[in-house]
């Protein structure tokens, strides 16, 4: 009975190991960038609202905050690495890569809300 339980547990955990190294790295970096991406998403919405409502002073300050996030060297380095990995992942032969990354993005989107 223990052997069957062990076999089932190991079979269920196989998809996590099925991801390519590039996908694992992409997902790791994306998870590290999640708070910054969430803040950028909120700032984009606030900027759009301020522009519609013609609150020019707010637009200026929000854009400055957004630019400050982009100037962070650590963030810029991680975003550059994601840009390098993305073409490799689009051509990946592993069918699990893109679905796992998409699942992570959807979960991050709803956590940010």
Locations of regions flagged by a protein language model:
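Sec-dependent signal peptide recognition
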Residues: 2-7
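N-terminal signal peptide c-region/cleavage motif recognized by signal peptidases
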Residues: 13-15
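Compact alpha-helical subdomains of small soluble proteins
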Residues: 63-113
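Immediate post-signal-peptide N-terminus of mature secreted/exported proteins
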Residues: 18-57, 110-112
């Amino acid at each position: 009975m223990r052997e069957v339980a062990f076999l089932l547990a190991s079979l269920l955990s196989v998809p996590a190991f099925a991801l390519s190294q590039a996908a694992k790295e992409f997902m790791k970096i994306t998870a590290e960038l999640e708070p910054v991406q969430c803040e950028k998403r909120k700032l984009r919405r606030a900027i759009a609202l301020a522009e519609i409502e013609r609150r020019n002073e707010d637009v200026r300050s929000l854009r400055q905050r957004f630019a400050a996030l982009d100037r962070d060297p650590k963030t810029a380095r991680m975003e550059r690495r994601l840009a390098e990995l993305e073409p490799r992942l689009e051509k990946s032969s592993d069918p699990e890569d893109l679905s796992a990354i998409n699942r992570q993005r959807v979960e991050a989107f709803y956590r940010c809300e």
